[in-house]
């Protein structure tokens, strides 16, 4: 890789990491190409980006993005997204399906370096859409109960009139 290519990779990763709220670092040693493609498809479906890059280049990109110092070693694949949950969920789901070959090492969530347990904890949280659905359901409960009560009152009045 030439110096120019390295610079382009660093610039790309710096921009991506600055705009993302979660970066997950995983060990992918032993995964086949087909399994990696499955991970990429799953990530794309969840608005998460995936890339394998040299540890030294990622370390420089993380420093340039002012996300702290992260120590990287071994074979790493990086997943990132513009929300805190989706990258963690994709990594956790794939790690569960490929326990022997894929493991979450660490992550950077909202600018703070996190260990694997914190990444797993974020993966267990409901997504934004799920939370909005729960909130809408809670808001609709009283309205639904009120309409059921009105309907029962209407039926009672009709029975009394008949």
From Swiss-Prot:
Designated name of the protein: Large ribosomal subunit protein uL10
Summary of the function given for this chain in its UniProt record: Forms part of the ribosomal stalk, playing a central role in the interaction of the ribosome with GTP-bound translation factors.
Cysteine-cysteine disulfides: none
GO cellular component: ribonucleoprotein complex; ribosome
Stored InterPro entries: Ribosomal_uL10 (IPR001790), Ribosomal_uL10-like_sf (IPR043141), Ribosomal_uL10_bac (IPR022973), Ribosomal_uL10_bac_type (IPR047865)
Presence of the UniProt keyword rRNA-binding in the record: yes
Assembly notes: Part of the ribosomal stalk of the 50S ribosomal subunit. The N-terminus interacts with L11 and the large rRNA to form the base of the stalk. The C-terminus forms an elongated spine to which L12 dimers bind in a sequential fashion forming a multimeric L10(L12)X complex.
Matches recorded under SUPFAM superfamilies: Ribosomal protein L10-like
Biological processes per GO annotation: translation
């Amino acid at each position: 890789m030439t110096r120019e290519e390295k610079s382009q990779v660093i610039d790309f990763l710096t921009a991506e990491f600055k705009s993302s709220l979660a970066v997950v670092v995983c060990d992918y040693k032993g995964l086949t190409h087909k399994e990696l493609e499955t991970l990429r498809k799953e990530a794309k479906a969840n608005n998460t980006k995936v890339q394998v890059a040299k540890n030294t280049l990622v370390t420089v990109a993380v420093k340039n993005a002012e996300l702290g110092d992260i120590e990287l070693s071994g074979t790493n694949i990086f997943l990132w997204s513009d929300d805190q949950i989706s990258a963690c969920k994709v990594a956790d789901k794939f790690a569960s399906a490929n326990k022997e070959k894929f493991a979450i090492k660490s992550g950077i969530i909202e600018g703070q370096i996190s260990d694997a347990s914190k990444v797993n904890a974020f993966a267990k949280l409901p997504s934004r859409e799920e939370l909005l659905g729960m909130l809408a359901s809670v808001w609709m409960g009283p309205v639904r109960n009120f309409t059921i009560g009105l309907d029962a009152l209407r039926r009672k009045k009709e029975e009394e009139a008949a």
